């Protein structure tokens, strides 16, 4: 009789286990999709936050440069059309503007390629500004910030580059200066990305931003700022053909690991991305699956025990019937 009870309990539990497994698989598939969608949504929001930080950074610097340009152009043309005039009437303003905005350097590149500049070297000489040019084997007219500002006749921002003094990424923002139809020169500021990097260090996720030359200039992961340490060409090339905020997967060349990414263009010259290992993205999904498996096992164990006692109770009359039948046939 105990054998019958056990077999009935096992058969009932086997049916229950099959049902639970089917239900668990179906639930897991729906939960996996839901969780993955939420993870992608969160990663996309990280990129949007990074994009906003970059836009604010450029907007602030562009506005500051335009404000200085307006201030410079308030002077009559005779106070701007020569190096001596610039040094006399504008030089000190460059120093004041640089200190107020914490810029690396502020300068005017003249049509002859010479600079009137306020920078760390002028600070070292304990002067507000200095000249820099042919005597130093430098010609502003050969530099991209000058060429592009003159060619486009509007504000221009260079790709990021490493400042030799601070060894940190920086940009040059430049704009042409015209007074009464006369070209005065190109006004420019060199801007360190320290403020932008400080913002990124408080952002969630592994977000970073790079320029047209695939140089990372701000990142929540500081190792990405070390030039040559990581090759971002794989993610950069895919980002060019993907829509903004379109999730995709790529293989990192350094270790062959599969990774998940979401990217977006910023001003059509920068790209903001978030890149995470696939395992990290899928971790919440498999955590749910593990919890479900544990729950199924616990339910099965308890159901076996419970069904055994239930079957024992409801099959107990069979023992009396069996005894009666045995006695009856013995009597016959």
Question: Across the structure, where does each feature detected by a protein language model lie?
Answer:
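Extreme N-terminal signal-anchor transmembrane helix of membrane signaling/transducer proteins, especially
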Residues: 2-37, 41, 293-298
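Juxtamembrane interface helices immediately C-terminal to a transmembrane segment
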Residues: 9, 27-57, 61, 78-82, ...
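Cytoplasm-proximal transmembrane signaling helix
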Residues: 13, 17, 209, 271-323, ...
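Extracytoplasmic/periplasmic sensory segments of membrane signal-transduction proteins
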Residues: 41-49, 57-154
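Solvent-exposed, extracytoplasmic
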Residues: 86-102, 182, 186-225
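Extracytoplasmic/periplasmic ligand-binding sensor regions of membrane-associated signaling proteins
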Residues: 99, 118-191, 196-199, 252
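Extracellular/periplasmic juxtamembrane segments that couple receptor/chemosensory ectodomains to their
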Residues: 213, 222-223, 229-291
């Amino acid at each position: 009789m105990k054998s019958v009870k056990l077999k009935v309990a096992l058969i009932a539990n086997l049916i229950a286990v099959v049902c639970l497994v089917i239900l668990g698989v179906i639930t897991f598939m729906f939960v996996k999709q839901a969780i993955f969608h939420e993870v992608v949504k969160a990663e996309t929001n990280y990129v949007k936050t990074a994009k906003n930080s970059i836009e604010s950074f450029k907007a602030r610097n562009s506005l500051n440069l335009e404000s200085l340009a307006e201030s410079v152009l308030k002077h009559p043309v005779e106070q701007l059309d020569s190096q001596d005039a610039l040094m006399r009437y504008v030089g000190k303003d460059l120093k004041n503007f640089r200190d107020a905005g914490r810029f690396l350097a502020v300068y005017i590149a003249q049509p002859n390629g010479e600079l009137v500049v306020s920078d760390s070297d002028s600070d070292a000489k304990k002067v507000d500004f200095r000249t820099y040019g042919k005597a130093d084997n430098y010609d502003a007219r050969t530099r991209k910030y000058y060429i592009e500002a003159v060619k486009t006749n509007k504000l221009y921002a260079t790709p990021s580059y490493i400042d030799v003094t601070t060894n940190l990424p920086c940009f040059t923002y430049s704009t042409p200066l015209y007074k009464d139809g006369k070209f005065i020169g190109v006004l420019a500021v060199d801007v360190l990305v320290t403020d932008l990097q400080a913002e990124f260090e408080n952002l969630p996720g592994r977000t970073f931003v790079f320029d047209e030359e695939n140089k990372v200039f701000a990142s929540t992961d500081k190792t990405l700022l070390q030039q040559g340490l990581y090759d971002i060409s794989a993610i950069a090339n895919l980002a060019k053909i993907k829509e903004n905020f379109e999730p995709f997967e790529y293989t990192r060349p350094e270790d062959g690991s599969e990774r998940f990414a979401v990217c977006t263009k910023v001003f059509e010259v920068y790209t903001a991305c978030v890149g995470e290992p696939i395992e990290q993205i899928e971790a919440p999904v498999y955590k749910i699956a593990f919890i479900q498996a544990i729950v199924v096992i616990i339910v099965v164990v308890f159901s076996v025990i419970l069904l055994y006692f239930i079957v024992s109770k409801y099959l107990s009359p069979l023992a009396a019937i069996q005894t009666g039948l045995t006695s009856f046939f013995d009597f016959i």
